[in-house]
From Swiss-Prot:
GO molecular function, one term: mRNA binding
Name of the gene this protein is made from: rplM
Recorded family membership: Belongs to the universal ribosomal protein uL13 family.
Keyword Metal-binding: no
Protein name: Large ribosomal subunit protein uL13
Lineage: Bacteria, Pseudomonadati, Thermodesulfobacteriota, Desulfuromonadia, Geobacterales
GO CC term, one of those recorded: ribosome
UniProt function note: This protein is one of the early assembly proteins of the 50S ribosomal subunit, although it is not seen to bind rRNA by itself. It is important during the early stages of 50S assembly.
Length: 143
């Protein structure tokens, strides 16, 4: 009888990947990033263990959205006070905080459980081309 080997947290080796978001479509890029954060392309992938790698995204301010999503797509949050629902379009969010647009897209593609918070901590997003993770020697990932 064959048994399935379950990955343990201590056995996982984590790599660093660098993604350039310049002229990339948000959704297509976010799905690839979510798969890397989960570790789905590794042979030791286990759904109940965080086997994913670190991802550094640069040039978040230069990403693309298809169609009229810059003007039509709305992002909502609530302040907690009565009548405190706030909304912002995707175009204004790119101007104000381009990192949040990628982070929200990837967060929606991760599992809705406790592991998602640990996976999201491995995502580092920067609006410009510079990042402070050169010491980790990230591999360039072409998406």
């Amino acid at each position: 009888m064959k048994t399935t080997k379950v990955a343990k947290k201590e056995e996982v080796t984590r790599d660093w990947y660098l993604v350039d978001a310049d002229n990339k479509v948000l959704g297509r890029m976010a799905t690839e990033i979510a798969n890397i954060l989960r570790g789905k392309k590794k042979p030791i992938y286990t759904p109940s263990v965080d086997t994913g790698d670190f991802v550094v995204v640069v040039n978040a301010a230069k990403l693309q959205l298809t169609g009229n999503k810059l003007a039509d797509k709305m992002y909502y949050h609530h302040t907690g006070f009565p009548g405190g629902i706030k909304s912002i379009t995707a175009g204004k969010l790119i101007e104000k905080k381009p990192e949040d647009l990628i982070r929200k897209a990837v967060k929606g593609m991760l599992p809705k459980n406790k592991l998602a918070r640990h996976m999201l901590k491995k995502l580092k997003v920067y609006a410009g081309p510079e990042h402070p993770h050169e010491a980790q020697q990230p591999k360039t990932l072409d998406i």
